[in-house]
Design a protein with these regions (language model features):
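Helix-loop-helix hairpins and the membrane-proximal interhelical loops
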Residues: 1-50, 169, 210-305, 449-453
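Helix-loop-helix junctions within the multi-pass membrane cores of secondary transporters/permeases
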Residues: 2-37, 58, 79-88, 92-140, ...
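Alpha-helical membrane-protein architecture signal
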Residues: 13, 17, 189, 268-272, ...
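Hydrophobic/aromatic residues within the transmembrane alpha-helices of Major Facilitator Superfamily
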Residues: 24-31, 64, 68, 145, ...
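Helix-coil boundary and interhelical linker segments in multi-pass alpha-helical membrane proteins
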Residues: 39-50, 89-100, 264-268, 368, ...
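Loop-to-helix transition at the N-terminal end of transmembrane alpha-helices
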Residues: 45-64
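Juxtamembrane transmembrane-helix boundary signature
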Residues: 59-80, 111
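Membrane-embedded alpha-helical modules
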Residues: 94-212, 348-458
Length: 458
């Protein structure tokens, strides 16, 4: 098989080695979803083992589609935030069964497919102004960095200031130095190691940073510096093969959708919430990562975006059938792009690893969050550099861009950043009389109105 011709590697100024490293890196930075998603959906009453298999399988299928239909280095998996909405709001909060929630996700996926085939999502992507697209990239960078700081527990909750820096003297979560403290220290060391590797232009610097940090953690565990305490949430860093190699059955969740919810008034609200967050998280990720990788053309459009959007839509539908919440394009795809990934070969490698994770789950689940956190922080820095592309000389462009940027990390949502960016862009340009001069797309006005209505009624 000629991978160069299949994925147009030379045209995209990349090679097989770079793409493979990028795919591995992306997978490593988002492998946590294999552990986190089952934990979250289990709260809704779903079988943990079945959800693990559904998570890995739906990620594999959706990411393979991304490689085949778009030839872009984007990787898909059940989205964080959407899974929490599924479990804690729809099921535990509103009282619906997880089977009914899966039906809502399935219907959302079907609508997504129709929207993708009719170019609606592509039109939305193209309607967003270039400066706002660069702002989305920067905002996602800050958002990723903040997630990394949280995963490393460098940033912790604070009742007075909402967040504060971790203290080795007093842990807010009740951990000790040998459980929590040492992992924070390892994350900081890992951040410095990854930064130095980046400065030295070491190939695969982000992946090496993850592996070295994990390796240091294993050494700390073997020497007694890190003491696992599973009951308190501090797990062993060594892969556990005590149960051998087996794939958990997906039977408890496969095709268990209950469509009786379709006839309930709340269904429209539930489905729209899934639809809205999935659509604009995906668009935000595509805009941000593609902008950073210089994949956008001179008009700010992403060639062959339809294939990427269709892969995302089909992934959501397949995910619901398997038994998991909404599948979406992961912002961690930026880590692979930062490693030089530019084609579908990157996503194919990540997809294969998701497939292998079904058999080698003990290895992938042993990679701790403190080892992947430095990678997220560094990727955040790399995406932040797009701020230089924003036109700060034009306040009608700069202020909406600023609002979009700060909204993402502060509101912990890519879609909220896009919403506020679009609303502020339209209002500021209309009031200042710049709208006609800039020929703002009609679709931007429609989006602004829809976003305002969302804040009023949802």
């Amino acid at each position: 098989m000629n991978l160069d011709k299949l994925f147009h590697l030379k045209e995209n100024h990349t090679d097989v080695k770079t793409e493979v490293m990028a795919g591995i890196t992306t997978f490593m930075t988002m492998a946590y979803i294999l552990a986190v998603n089952p934990n979250i959906l289990e709260a809704s009453g779903m079988d943990r083992g079945a959800v693990f298999t559904a998570t890995a399988l739906s990620s594999f299928i959706a990411t393979c589609l991304m490689a085949a239909l778009s030839n872009y280095p984007f990787v898909l998996a059940p989205g964080m935030g959407l899974n929490a909405y599924f479990a804690y709001t729809v099921v535990l909060g509103m009282g619906y069964s997880w089977q009914q929630a899966l039906a809502a996700v399935f219907v959302e996926g079907i609508i997504f497919i129709l929207l993708s085939l009719t170019n609606v999502r592509e039109a939305i992507f193209n309607a967003i102004p270039m400066n706002l697209k660069h702002a989305v990239s920067v905002g996602i960078g800050l958002f990723i960095a903040f997630i990394g700081l949280q995963n490393a527990k460098i940033v912790v909750n604070n009742d007075s200031t909402l967040v504060s820096v971790f203290s080795f003297k007093s842990s807010v979560s009740g951990g000790t130095f040998n459980t929590e403290g040492i992992t924070v220290l390892l994350a900081l060391i890992g951040l410095l190691i990854t930064a130095i590797l980046l400065v030295k232009s070491v190939k695969g610097n982000i992946l090496w940073g993850i592996l070295i940090t994990w390796g240091l953690g294993i050494i700390c565990q073997l020497t007694g510096l890190y003491k696992p305490d599973p009951a308190a949430g501090w797990f062993s860093l060594l892969p556990d093969f005590s149960n051998g190699i087996s794939i958990p059955s997906m039977a408890p969740t496969f095709m268990k959708m209950d469509f009786s919810i379709v006839f309930i008034l709340d269904f429209v609200v539930i489905m729209f919430a899934f639809l809205f967050v999935d659509m604009f998280d995906t668009l935000g990720t595509l805009i941000g990562v593609a902008s950073k990788a210089d994949m956008l053309d001179k008009e700010g459009k992403l060639p062959n975006i339809k294939g990427a959007l269709l892969s995302d839509a089909v992934g959501t539908t397949v995910g619901a059938m398997c038994g998991t919440s909404t599948v979406t394009t992961f912002v961690e795809s930026a880590s692979g792009v930062a490693e030089g990934g530019r084609t579908g070969l990157t996503s194919l490698v990540a997809a294969i690893l998701f497939g292998l994770s079904l058999l080698l789950s003990p290895i992938f689940l042993a990679i701790p969050s403190f080892a992947t956190a430095p990678a997220l922080i560094i990727v955040g820095f790399l995406m932040l550099t797009s701020v230089t592309k924003i036109d700060f000389n034009d306040m009608t462009e700069a202020i909406p861009a600023f609002i979009a940027i700060i909204a993402m990390p502060f509101l912990y949502s890519i879609s909220e950043g896009i919403s506020m960016g679009v609303i502020s862009y339209v209002i500021i340009n209309v009031v200042t009389g710049k709208a006609k001069e800039k020929k703002i797309s009609v679709l931007m006005y429609v989006l602004a109105v829809l976003f305002i209505l969302k804040y009023i009624f949802i």
